[in-house]
Amino acid sequence: MARKPTPPGTPQPTSVGHIVDLVRGAVPPLHPAGLPFVLAPLGVAVLGRNRKWVRRGALTSAAACAAFFRHPHRVPPNRVGVAVAPADGEVALVDSAVPPSELDMGTEPLPRVSIFLSVLDVHVQRSPVGGEVTKVVHRSGQFLSADLADASEVNERNSMLLHTAEGHDVAVIQIAGLLARRIVCDAKVGDTLPIGDTYGLIRFGSRVDTYFPAGTTLLAERGQRTIGAETVIAQLP
């Protein structure tokens, strides 16, 4: 992301302040859910500072966790009626399927886009459309590999239903995986989410399914890489 130009007359920052500003602009912020995973190894590094292998191992672990829980700024497209990717990752499925029963969206298959997140991807989830949260349902289940077709049905999941201003219902499903054993969803019924707004996170590898209303044109392709909040994956009817 390009840095904003400095307006004329702006006081010049000190060398230390300038370095801090550059670091803030270059390093993505950390999602709050990742703080314990970063602080714990940092504490180990401090306690074991006299042992080089302990210090290095702990600092490496802290850096890896900070990278995993990064929360980069994103700019959604300013286009009417589009849906954006709810996560970074690779499109695993572009098809039609029956939405999770707990959302009461009926038994007819609806257009669906599934995105698989590897451990190297950004793992925050973002709202694919702007709308009001009308349902949030967590369901316990198994922890199969998230890239398997059955994962959407049998794995632990958190389902959220959004109702847009145009009257469309869009469902986003956070699905746990082989390593992802913790789903975080900060959205609550009654909340209004702007398109691209961060609402949750899945720890360490996962999958996100998005169900759209009938008549939606799916624009994503299997194998495509997506950028959460920015890649357009569908055009609503």
Curated annotation (Swiss-Prot):
GO terms for cellular component: plasma membrane. Keywords: Cell membrane, Decarboxylase, Lipid biosynthesis, Lipid metabolism, Lyase, Membrane, Phospholipid biosynthesis, Phospholipid metabolism, Pyruvate, Zymogen. One of its GO terms (biological process) is phosphatidylethanolamine biosynthetic process. It comes from the Bacteria. It catalyses: a 1,2-diacyl-sn-glycero-3-phospho-L-serine + H(+) = a 1,2-diacyl-sn-glycero-3-phosphoethanolamine + CO2. The record marks G205, S206 as: Cleavage (non-hydrolytic). It holds the Pfam family PS_Dcarbxylase. Is synthesized initially as an inactive proenzyme. Formation of the active enzyme involves a self-maturation process in which the active site pyruvoyl group is generated from an internal serine residue via an autocatalytic post-translational modification. Two non-identical subunits are generated from the proenzyme in this reaction, and the pyruvate is formed at the N-terminus of the alpha chain, which is derived from the carboxyl end of the proenzyme. The active site is at S206. Its cofactor is pyruvate. Binds 1 pyruvoyl group covalently per subunit. The modification Pyruvic acid (Ser) is found at S206. PANTHER family: ARCHAETIDYLSERINE DECARBOXYLASE PROENZYME-RELATED (PTHR35809:SF1). Catalyzes the formation of phosphatidylethanolamine (PtdEtn) from phosphatidylserine (PtdSer). Heterodimer of a large membrane-associated beta subunit and a small pyruvoyl-containing alpha subunit. This is Phosphatidylserine decarboxylase proenzyme. It comes from Rhodococcus opacus (strain B4).
